[in-house]
C-alpha cells in the first residue's frame, strides 16, 4: 500500500498524538470536524490544523505572524491559546500558499538539509536543493568514503553526512 505525501503528513500527526495517549477516537473526531470546517480531505496535513504532540489545534486566522489558535480538547473544541508555542512544530513543514496543505517536510528540522517534497523524486528523501536521494548516498557510502560520495555528487561534506545519518536513523527506527 502506497501513501501519498499528505497521508504521510497526517500519519505523522496521528502517531505523535497516539504516542502521547490521545485516543484514535478523539483524533478521528477532530479530523472529521476539521475536514468539514476547512473543506479539505487532509485536515491533519493543513497549516490550519496541527498538533503539539498532545493536542489538536487549528488556526483562527491565516495571519503569517503568530496567529491565535483553537485547541481541540475531548470535551470542548474552542479554547484559544497563543500561536508562538507552535513555531518549532510548524517550522519543519512548508505549506502551499494556495491550499494551506503541507508541501515540503524537513523531518529533522530545517537546519538539516534533508527534505521530502512530493514534487521532487516522488517524495523520496533528498538533499535539499539537489534532488539527490539520501538512499543513494547511503548505499554508496557503504563501499567508499563519505568524501568521495560528496565529490561525486557535487555536495558539501556536511550535506553528504546529513543524508547518510538520516538513512542510518531510518534503518534503526
Language-model segments: residues:
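Conserved AdoMet
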Residues: 5
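Long, charge-rich, low-complexity intrinsically disordered regions
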Residues: 2, 10-13, 18-143, 147-151, ...
Amino acid at each position: 500500500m502506497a501513501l501519498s505525501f499528505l497521508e504521510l503528513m497526517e500519519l505523522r500527526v496521528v502517531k505523535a498524538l497516539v504516542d502521547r495517549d490521545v485516543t484514535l477516537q478523539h483524533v478521528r473526531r477532530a479530523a472529521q470536524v476539521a475536514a468539514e470546517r476547512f473543506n479539505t480531505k487532509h485536515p491533519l496535513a493543513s497549516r490550519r490544523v496541527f498538533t503539539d504532540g498532545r493536542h489538536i489545534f487549528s488556526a483562527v486566522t491565516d495571519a503569517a505572524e503568530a496567529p491565535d489558535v483553537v485547541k481541540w480538547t475531548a470535551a470542548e473544541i474552542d479554547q484559544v491559546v497563543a500561536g508562538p508555542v507552535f513555531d518549532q512544530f510548524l517550522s519543519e513543514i512548508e505549506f502551499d500558499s494556495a491550499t494551506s496543505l503541507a508541501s515540503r517536510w524537513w523531518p529533522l528540522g530545517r537546519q538539516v538539509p534533508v527534505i521530502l517534497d512530493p514534487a521532487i523524486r516522488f517524495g523520496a528523501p533528498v538533499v535539499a536543493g539537489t534532488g539527490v536521494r539520501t538512499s543513494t548516498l547511503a548505499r554508496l557510502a557503504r563501499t567508499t568514503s563519505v568524501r568521495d560520495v560528496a565529490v561525486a555528487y557535487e555536495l558539501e561534506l556536511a550535506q553528504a553526512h546529513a543524508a547518510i545519518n538520516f538513512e542510518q536513523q531510518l534503518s534503526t527506527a
